Amino acid sequence: MAASSTVTLCTRLDFCYCVNSDYRDAIDANVARVRGLIAGHKAQGKAIGYLSVPLSPAGGGSFAVNAEIAAATASSVTARLGAQSAWILNPGAEGGDRMNGAGGADFMYMWTQILEGRNGAGEDFDFFYFAGPFDFASFFKLTGQGDLERLEAWFDARAAQDPSFMTAVDNGSITRAGFRNYYGLRASVAFSYGSHDDWNIARAINARRRGAADFGIANQLAIFFDGHPVTPGSYEEPTAAGDAGRCVK
């Protein structure tokens, strides 16, 4: 079997990724599918959001747990805004069933196209929501008292009840201390490769909107972090790239 090849692919706003060419058709198909999903909700008059949330286990977390947190956060944001009036795109739920084994750059090339929209102004979206420490704390029911100990207890209970989680513990892909420290000290978009790119995408979209006669400052994307609106001085600043970057030959 021939080895997979990689290729640099760039989006309308010039975000470039080193993409595994085996996933190009799957990416194109899911971009079209998710755009259709968004269009259906827009046709109902809903405000459309995007949830930026860590999904990778990088740093000590668990993909399965992160996916559960993403779903819980999406549900919480939807409840806050009203399900009849808003819909939020959860990347943990809409990654596509043909993307198994894909890497971060493959996923980000896909999400970047969806977020930018056909015109590069993020015209399908009204707001971005970046998950933060309090979103994670809410999932684990942390109280601000003995939080790391609560996370250790949560880890022990999950390992006792979930065979796949216990398997990950046994093979060393997740550890009690790593889990505790990640979710207790670093659980946030601040430590996510993909979310770093999401932030820069939101910034680029708003920069384009500010300079467009049909958008302008008044019609920028609303940006939320950890449940609160972000100030203009913050969301106009870039952050370090995550998965974005050209292939190195």
Whereabouts are the PLM-identified features?
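Conserved catalytic or regulatory cores that recognize and/or transform ribose-phosphate-containing ligands
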Residues: 2-249
